[in-house]
Amino acid sequence: ASLAQITKNAIALEDVFGFDVVESLRAANSLTDQFGISAEEAFNLIVQGAQKGLNQNDDLLDTINEYSVQFRNAGYSADDMFNMLANGAETGTWSIDKLGDAVKEFNIRMSDGTANEYLEQLGLNTEEVIAQFNKGGPEAQAAIGDIMEALQECDDATLQYQAGVGLFGTMWEDLGVDTVASLMDTQGAIQSTSDAMAQLDSAAYDTLESS
């Protein structure tokens, strides 16, 4: 996309959602840098995120800027990230900054060895799970899936709580098992290949023309 088109997109986001133009450009840039997608795809995702209500607390663009690297490091795509945030938010957590923070805390604990004892307590093969997580991409996602399954199926409430906090930090206390499980679900309708931005552009342009 040309610079003119990118700027036009950012202005349309300002008109429709009240997003600051510079912040929109920065968020789109974060997405292209971290996930290797095009500017057009980045704007498609931002539009769909806003349409899903992810900016209820005015923290969508900040969350993209701050946490894209964390989702990428955990093996997720840009599409995954937006669907995860939408799924987490649907459980009633509209402060999506907290959802991003949960992924960040999890990454740190998986990387620095803090997670090991909790993975063991959940009955997982720690070495295997960590090695799989460190491969990134689908391998990492599969490892995370195993961890979430073990957490959800844990009948011992005390152990579940300890392991949850051990893996996700204080975000586990803030969010709870259902929200974290939803957050770790990548299924959803948000796609970078949609034409959400083009549709918004034409609608915003029509409005400007007629006003």
Regions found by a protein language model. Give the residues of each.
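Solvent-exposed, membrane-proximal periplasmic/extracellular interface segments of envelope transport
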Residues: 1-3, 136
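Short hydrophobic/aromatic segments of transmembrane alpha-helices and their interfaces
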Residues: 4-5, 123
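Active-site-adjacent structural elements in enzyme catalytic domains
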Residues: 8
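Amphipathic/coiled-coil alpha-helical interface segments used
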Residues: 18-21, 29-32, 36-211
